[in-house]
Regions:
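N-terminal cysteine/histidine-rich coordination modules
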Residues: 1-73, 77
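C-terminal, charged low-complexity interaction regions
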Residues: 133-173
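Generic structural hydrophobic/aromatic packing signal, biased to beta-strands
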Residues: 22-27, 31, 59-62, 66, ...
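Extended interfacial segments that mediate partner engagement and assembly in macromolecular machines
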Residues: 69-136
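Residues in flexible loops and secondary-structure boundaries
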Residues: 32-35, 39-41, 67, 107-109, ...
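Amphipathic alpha-helical interaction surfaces
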Residues: 65-68, 116, 120, 144, ...
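General N-terminal targeting signals
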Residues: 39-41, 116-118, 123-124, 151, ...
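Residue-level detector of secondary-structure boundary/capping sites
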Residues: 15-18, 50, 101, 125, ...
Length: 173
């Protein structure tokens, strides 16, 4: 069990520049939403549009490919990707609630938070960080065991992470 968790102060949008794992609308397998591959080469500033950058949906099982043009308002609803509105792949029921994550790094952050004995807020005050907005049932130490079991269930059904950091930036040393 981690001793400490330090809030990295990111919002839910900070997880959108990485792979978002979704259910393919055609074959129901695991598909991936990423920043469109041509986006980085077409602009001098890759971070210019951030969460509003063009996206691509690809399913390696059935070869479905779709594009989202970007620059429009993102639809943000729980357990769906904000670009194509597809159900997230990384989700499961947990004590009458739905536990979900956009991708591996998001799931890692949730696990780090839940396992920590001590949870520290970030240096800046405010309530806009994703961690500060987690639901009460997920934050409760009483639900720790059940939430960790749900995270393990999600991981068992997840495809391997393409890039796994050596250590999580959310863990305090």
């Amino acid at each position: 069990m981690n001793e400490r968790f330090r809030d990295p102060r990111g919002t839910w949008m900070s997880f959108l520049d990485e792979e978002i794992l979704v259910r393919c609308p055609d074959c129901q397998g695991c598909a991936v939403v990423t920043v469109h591959p041509r986006y980085d080469t077409q602009t001098a500033e890759p971070s210019y549009l951030g969460a509003f950058a063009p996206r691509r949906l690809v399913c390696s099982a059935c070869l479905l490919a779709r594009e989202w043009p970007g620059k429009t308002i993102i639809r943000h609803t729980d357990a769906r990707d904000p670009y194509f509105g597809l159900p997230l792949w990384l989700q499961t029921r947990c004590g009458g609630n739905l536990l979900w994550a956009y991708g591996h790094r998001h799931l890692d952050l949730l696990e780090d938070y839940v396992t920590a004995r001590h949870r520290e807020r970030g240096a800046r005050p405010g309530s806009m960080s994703m961690v500060e907005r987690l639901p009460t049932w997920l934050k409760s130490a009483r639900n720790r065991s059940e939430v960790l079991k749900a995270i393990r269930r999600i991981r068992r059904g997840a495809p391997p992470s393409r890039h796994r950091p050596e250590s999580s930036p959310t863990r305090a040393d």
